[in-house]
Amino acid sequence: MDRLSGPDLPAEEGVPCHNQDMVVWTETGDIGARLRRLAAALDSIPEAREEWPFSTDVGRLARSVRDYLLPRVENTSRPLTVVFAGPTGAGKSTLLNSIAGADVSSTGALRPTTRAPVALVAEEHADDHREIGGVECQLVTGGAPILKSMTLVDTPDVDSTETNHRIVAETLVDHADIVVFVTSALRYADAVPWQVLRRARARGTDVITVLNRISPATAGAMVDFRTRLTAAGLGDHLLTIPEHHLAPEADRLPGLAVRSLRKRLVGIASSREAHAAATLQRVTAATAAQVGALVDEIEQLIERRDEFHDELSFDLSSELEAIALHGVTAGFHEELPEAGSGLRISRWLRRNRRRPEEIPPLETRLADRLTSLVRGEMRRLVEGYQPTPRREAMTDVVDSQLATAVPSPVSEWLSFVRRIGEPQPGRQWSAEAALVDSACSGRVTAEADVLFGADAGALVERARRELVGRLQVIGAGVAAGITDLAYPGLGEVDLEGLRSAHAALVSRFALVHA
């Protein structure tokens, strides 16, 4: 941390920032706890996806709540954070040095000049500014009285070719109480800086716009820039600084060149408490609006998810109601001749008679085959469901689910079939196989008719109803799994926390214009 002994900023008569409101806090109560819950609730929201984008950058909003709102609610005496931001070559660092009256931030022709944020801070406030929004700052301490009311921060270029520099600059803008937006006659119309400018203003941050390096040849830029600011709803208050040809070793402009900006900052510093309250009020209102919009979007998304789940569940349930699995026991026993006499039926019964020790292995094979058939049919039904998103990943998820979900219900159903069959001695296997075939295919087979007689229809209906019910339970689980895949993490969202925090933000603060 560097120690700066530059000249104090003069105590000139202040000029209030153009969009400042005078506010009072009506009640804070447990707003800190509500904000912490809001940050946690925002953390619970899954990342936006192409299928359901959010209008708000949720991660950025969570950081703003945690790193901007909370510290200011808990410590209303902290100095204002004044961030100098702008495009490449706008002269931010030179301007900050000139305001400070000392060499705070490096300048030069090599771009980018400012690679890490530099904060000019009063020594007693240094700990509060080692990090801003999670971004580590290089600290330079100074003794100017204004630093008791505000910290001045130089940032990397908002349009830097290095992604990390842009992210750092945008993060600092998101955590500023005041943004001094510096651009030049050559760069004032560039698209990227305007995006940052609009976002800062949208979140309720005070913005001081500075058009640097004005010359007679570029005088038209001042008029055009002011027109653009007005059209964008940013007002027409524009500070201008003329072009100065500095010596190569010079890092500062003459004091007269930055007099209007220095005067503006001194004026804000003289009413720091009111300005901080006004800014906090506006950022709170903007945050409440963002959270409200986010709640609406998530509620709509949950509604879409529920509709998706209900439609998929209904379709699977309907398909399973009419499921027809054929040939479940093929090869396990000799089939009944199509046109047989009593003699042939007797022969068929004798040939399919199994000793008690032979039955368990047959039942195991039957369970494996039925499990395989059920998994295949369920997979076919799901793959035929057209609205299913993320089809590639879905197949793996469904296969994994079915591998664990099917075997146990199938085995339990086969045990149920054995219990209700009540076969005559020696006919246990024949009865089980006939009842399984009939229930799976949805029709009473000839074998079941022979074995169960007048009771065949009722037994088959009972077995089938039990089978379909178990399959529908599996189908419901598959539908839930596919829904989770289509809308990952949505079930973990603390929607009630979002609603509660939103209500607190709306009701706990009041704006009183003086």
Residue ranges of each PLM-predicted region?
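Canonical P-loop GTPase G-domain recognition
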Residues: S215-H275
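Conserved nucleotide-binding/hydrolysis micro-motifs of P-loop NTPases
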Residues: H125-A126, D157-D159, L186-Y188, I214-A217, ...
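Conserved C-terminal guanine-recognition region of P-loop GTPase G domains, centered on the G4
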Residues: C137-L147, I167-V179, T183-H237
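Short secondary-structure boundary/capping elements
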Residues: L61-V65, S160-H165, Y188-V192
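Conserved G1/Walker A P-loop phosphate-binding module
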Residues: V23-S149
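Extended helical scaffolds that flank P-loop GTPase cores
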Residues: H18-R78, P254-A257, R262-H513
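N-terminal amphipathic/basic-hydrophobic helices that include classical n-h-c signal peptides
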Residues: M1-D21
